[in-house]
Amino acid sequence: MMDVKSISVRVDGTEIQARAGATILDILNENGIEYPQICHVPEVDPIQTCDTCIVEANGKLVRSCATVAENGMSIDLSGNRVKEAQTEAMDRLLENHLLYCTVCDNNNGNCTLHNTAEMMGIEHQKYPYTPKEDPSCAVDMSHPFYRYDPNQCIACGQCVEVCQNLQVNETLSIDWERERPRVIWDEGVPINESSCVSCGQCVTVCPCNALMEKSMLGQAGFMTGIKEDVMEPMIDLVKNVEPGYGSIFAISEVEAAMRETRTKKTKTVCTFCGVGCSFEVWTKGRDILKIQPVSDAPVNAISTCVKGKFGWDFVNSKERITKPLIRKNGAFVESSWEEALDLVASRLGSIKEQYGKGSVGFISSSKITNEENYVIQKLARQVFETNNVDNCSRYCQSPATDGLFRTVGMGGDAGTIKDIAKAGLVIIVGANPAEGHPVLATRVKRAHKLHGQKLIVADLRKNEMAERSDLFISPKQGTDQVWLMAVTKYMIDQGWHDQAFIDENVNYFEDYKETLKTYTLDYAERITGLSKENIIQIAEMIRDADGTCVLWGMGVTQNTGGSDTSAAISNLLLATGNYRRPGAGAYPLRGHNNVQGACDMGTLPGWLPGYQHITDDKARAKFEEAYGVEIDGKPGLDNIQMLHAIEEGKMKAMYLVGEDMALVDSNANHVHDILSSLDFFVVQDIFLSRTAQYADVVLPATPSLEKDGTFTNTERRVQRLYQALPTLGDAKPDWWIIQEVANRLGANWNYSHPSDIFSEMASLSPLFAKASYEVLEGWNSFLWGSFTGESTPLLYEDGFNFPDKKARFALSDWTEPAAFPEEYDLHINNGRMLEHFHEGNMTNKSKGIQAKVPNVFVEISPELAQERGVCDGSLVRLVSPFGAVKLNALITDRVRKNELYLPMNSTDKESAINFLTGPAADKRTNTPAYKQTKVRMEVLGGCETAPLPKTNPRNKKRHPQNGVEAERKWNRPGYVHLTD
């Protein structure tokens, strides 16, 4: 009896077993049958514009991409009717496209139009090519990163479909009502004046050369970059001489093969946010030609954001440090590696000997690889015998991790981004993934737009996700825990909780109900400013949803009660049975490409690699045997405690890698004073950051494109990155530098490649026991989560990470926000902008990004602006008890009343947010309460030019539609259908 999940079809007379529900084209592709499909994008629904995929199914001509196969179906791929229809379809496309493949910038072996024409044996065109628009002015070069040539556009609609329904940025469409249809941006404006957010998805999927990265123009080919007045006669000459396209294609194939000899394509993992996008980087020498995502990428597939696609100029920036620097007589002097490393080792070693093991501290990095983080904690624990090691998760994610450890036993995402996309309801609290985690946000936007997913957003600011949501709530700052607990209490009171799940899986329910007694609807309304009706509506939406995922970020964690609010999120999910199942669970959005990995590798004062606690005697003994030293069973100092220890004179030296502590720590004025007081300070970085300016020695490291290694994303997914470029100047990978320092202090390490380091780490860490470079080869990945070492996409399938396998309700009350004197009457929020990454040390090296966002500014509500006499461009000074900044105002309804918003992408003392923030911190983890800052405002100047250019997409309106709307093409006057 045939499996109901499979069907049988006949393809050109051959019987094939196939998936039930698969389209005919799916079956062809899954069985390796090469077939035309110019407009097909596997990641989206069938586009149905090119008609090159037509087949005959049970005697009818149909589009194979949109026709679901039926059991017993007879499919003909080679009959005369099929071939005639396909040829007509291709002729209609080629009428819109001039074939000049040999001199084309896109002749790189991956041009779908070229390859399909060759596959089909096309020799001549039925319809001669004619341009749609005046060639002298048709090409839109307005955008900093890519260009569009309508006269090469075949109107296949791939770019439109992905913009509308995969990225869901909703900028592109095809004007099917034109005499000659073409792609348009918004209402037909130049690209750079549109709502385009520069994700580059359109360029990635374009099957020809209509959309091209500007960085590719004239760069890839041996015969590209030829001027128009020479190129056009060459094209005409070739067409007149050659008897058909076959000969022309043969020449272009030779040229494409020549390109392969100098164009290197290397798989890498993005170095910006925590989503973990992977893609190919195309290089020629040290030139980065383009970023090309592929369907095999496990997280993003073909998607990117502006930074991942276009934000790599920093790699070749002239501001890179390429030689070691030693401070002599108050100024930096270039030195040799020998001199610099000898000095670092001797000074750090002598300080340890003179002042003791606790006199040296280590700050690791969320930007460097897992392997490099591992050797940094090993340097601290083995060579310096100290647990004084931490990373930037202290500034952001430690409270989320703490809340999860207390409730479910593991500090990571419950599932994957695919689970988020599957959820019936997504709740986003204190996060702005459309700007901070853009590719992850696309999956939520797509599920919400097309698949009925519901969306709740809780934020002080009306960001893009709030605009799209079914319910947007804006509670008073620092009160998220109150409404979360009120929702939980209300659901329990109504009997909407999952009692069976709780009985089987969770401890302390009765104690938890006692804790909830205070959190009535009336209490929550008074504290949060939300209406009781909103709180009830949230409860009802959770009740009705088939799976709830909660995503949260710095708006939760960077508060005095960040850990307890994170625990409250987990409590709500436990009470409603939203763990241990797909499409549900807790998702703290990790901010950096490898902040998850930095923690996983043990660069934490209380944790050894693989989340083995420093107080665990057995775990510690294992590392002691491997390292040959005794490891202190007491946690070391975290980032914040290290600064206190420096101030108190107890810590004399610090070794900091890939972190701009002088800008990212709170109360920056005070931090600067502290760093200046160190006896010896080593900074390892790719730029002379603000922090590096306080160093005694600066060691030049390499960015991700110049080394091998692994990163771990927000899903707990480990992925390999491969060296794409040679190191610049004398810069070295961080793992090499650390090993050289360690060996000068007697360590005798002998790592020859990061794979050696990974193997050692995995041998000591059960979570990674079955991970290896072989497992991670190519596009493969590994998700930690099982102490028997298996890859674990969904956590807790075998129970929660406690001895009895049961989770625990956290019993925590709300902590009030930090108090400020009355004169500080405005609350100032902060966060990322889409175009920039954090303080901008990398993205501010990109001319294109800087053109989109040239300045930092403060967002002010229309109400406050009217009250205080502020307009766009007004110069204002913001003053807190801890410092002051001066910058221009941007009036926007994204903020309301007395709320201000200051993007964090500034390295300037005049405008960086942390010259305002103070010492308040999360009570459990010491994470600074960056979000609890109040200021007063002084208006210094009148109306000037708005600090956000008119060409920034925030000033534009989106144009949503459901994909390409191919029906409009079919309804054009005179359109002749090729299907039956």
Curated annotation (Swiss-Prot):
Residues reported in the UniProt entry to bind [4Fe-4S] cluster 2: C153, C156, C159, C206
Family to which the UniProt record says this protein belongs: In the C-terminal section; belongs to the prokaryotic molybdopterin-containing oxidoreductase family.
EC primary class: oxidoreductase
Region annotated Disordered, chain positions: 944-980
GO BP annotations listed: formate metabolic process; respiratory electron transport chain
Segments forming domain 2Fe-2S ferredoxin-type: 5-81
Organism field: Bacillus subtilis (strain 168)
Residue ranges annotated for the 4Fe-4S ferredoxin-type domain, each copy included: 144-171, 187-216
Boundaries of every 4Fe-4S His(Cys)3-ligated-type domain copy: 81-121
Residues that coordinate or bind [4Fe-4S] cluster 1: H97, C101, C104, C111
Protein name: Putative formate dehydrogenase YrhE
Start and end residues of each 4Fe-4S Mo/W bis-MGD-type domain: 263-319
Ligand binding ([2Fe-2S] cluster): C39, C50, C53, C65
UniProt EC number: 1.17.1.9
UniProtKB keywords: 2Fe-2S, 4Fe-4S, Iron, Iron-sulfur, Metal-binding, Molybdenum, NAD, Oxidoreductase, Repeat
Positions bound to [4Fe-4S] cluster 4: C270, C273, C277, C305
Annotated region (Formate dehydrogenase), positions in chain: 258-980
PANTHER family assigned: FORMATE DEHYDROGENASE H, RESPIRATORY NITRATE REDUCTASE
